[in-house]
Amino acid sequence: IITSALSIQDPRERPMDKQQASDEKHRRFHDKESDFLAFVNLWNYLGEQQKALSSNAFRRLCRTDYLNYLRVREWQDIYTQLRQVVKELGIPVNSEPAEYREIHIALLTGLLSHIGMKDADKQEYTGARNARFSIFPGSGLFKKPPKWVMVAELVETSRLWGRIAA
């Protein structure tokens, strides 16, 4: 779920003129310790809604929840493709959902250059090669930043932001 989510453009939309409204809609998926797990929460919600609603009603739901329907479909397609490849390679799939620790150890192996330690005086982190970044405002960790953080990507706009954090 997380791997396929990270391989596409984020399905959560945050229009400039509706940032607060979209943040409120997306907040229900937040995990207080990990934005990566927010993808799992969103995935579970979408699965429940897709089963309960007609195709058109599901599209409308995506629009009102500030979710891009085409990106959601792409996410689902990539997830299905990854499951098929894993099956063909004979790699065992968890029968139970993985725990927080196992998920983040697995993620950390691919994100070593995206680790940061919080500066005691500021809301900034110092990462690899002394890169200084802040947690993105849309993150579930933005208001209560941890001492150490791992982010999926660093994006430079008005400043350097760490997006999708744990």
Regions found by a protein language model. Give the residues of each.
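Second RecA-like catalytic domain
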Residues: 1-166
